[in-house]
């Protein structure tokens, strides 16, 4: 059985970005117990191999490995992971010197309701909105958000949700539905029987939510903000 697991773990060295390959790799990582030192050690070795490859761009597989190692019950594994990736696996780039370490920590801890609130706060600041005057965005604010920052926020959500969440994932769903908003709300789980979900109790604050479920946007204010977000130049050649 252990040899079989070792063979399965070795498949994680493959750094394919195909949807099917990523799905299988995520399933392998999920089978690893947090208190199994030998499996965690092997996983840590593979993690080092993956992220130190020249010009390698991390994805949600690395995100789940990072979470599994960092949330393990072994101090040696935690120390190794923290030293290897002191700021996580996503480069925290910002055009406005925004600190994303706090968002990264919340996502790794799977504290999604706090991460969602913090995401909205950061978007408001990035758009240059005075929080004392209003704590929401107009569609005209969206273009003020730098490309680099929007991509960083999206990459954090994607990396730490097994590829399920983030603005780009939402955008892909919206485009696949030919920009039909009613179908979009239903698909990502923001409406039940055509009635907007009540915040926060009717939303899913874990990875069991529908694909594209998070981060949230207040659809009661209309579709213009999300439409502007999905049309942002951050997604050009992304």
Swiss-Prot record:
Principal subcellular localisation of the protein: plastid
- List the gene name: ycf53
Please name the source species.
Answer: Porphyra purpurea
Molecular functions per Gene Ontology: tetrapyrrole binding
Annotated Gene3D superfamilies: 1.25.40.620, Gun4-like (1.10.10.1770)
Q: Which Pfam families match?
A: GUN4
Which compartments does it reside in?
Answer: Plastid, Chloroplast
InterPro entries (UniProt xref): GUN4-like, GUN4-like_sf
Name the UniProt record assigns to this protein: Uncharacterized protein ycf53
Taxon lineage:
Eukaryota, Rhodophyta, Bangiophyceae, Bangiales, Bangiaceae
